[in-house]
């Protein structure tokens, strides 16, 4: 009984265990890892978890904090990485979309920026040649984004875009998604299908340099659990979506934390077209020895 009675839920959609969003796959891996650690190290249940189990046994419901109601999800967007979101990403003849994926880091950035609808216009330019590991002689051409000459058309960025969406909407969302990738020097996938990746630690500099956001910081979870939870709760209570990332055996994934319910389950938008978005525990046993960042 050292594990929380409820680890997650969604208020809509269906769940297919064989086809989950990479972000949720990461969370499930973290839960599994934490439980394995607890079994091997005789971890004793946290008093709060004991209280939750008693509440379930007594009333069939978990013990909620009645000081606040559910907040969020703050981000109404359900964006993804494939076509048409990747319209302006590098061409890839081996990909069914004929373009590489946007990348989870850029998709998370873009959804948070859409929430703030800022800036109207960017600042400066960035050019780089994407690094490509073990690409067998293949190389991507130089990627360039002229942020300073781009007006971001927030009014034409709906919650989702489709193949048949107006071209103005597709171009507005795809431009922002691509620019976020260039801003963090995205490493785009090659034919091996590893996906497009970037370091979340580059986001604070990118958003201040190219998008005129205030100074922000990238934090890791190698601090006390209580401090980590307090920072998350403070951000959500202030209606500030949080960029969230973590690494596990399945790889590194980035997504958005943008809500919280009275049971302190947090809403995660996994950047997979709305698939598997829901309220989840950032922990399974009130013990954290794995790393995530925000």
For each feature predicted by the language model, list its residue ranges.
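Catalytic Cys-His active-site segments of thiol-dependent hydrolases/isopeptidases
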Residues: 1-14, 262-282
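Stable alpha-helical elements in mature extracytoplasmic
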Residues: 100, 105-112, 199, 203-207, ...
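Low-complexity, Gly/Ser/Thr/Pro-rich intrinsically disordered linker/tail segments
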Residues: 286-294
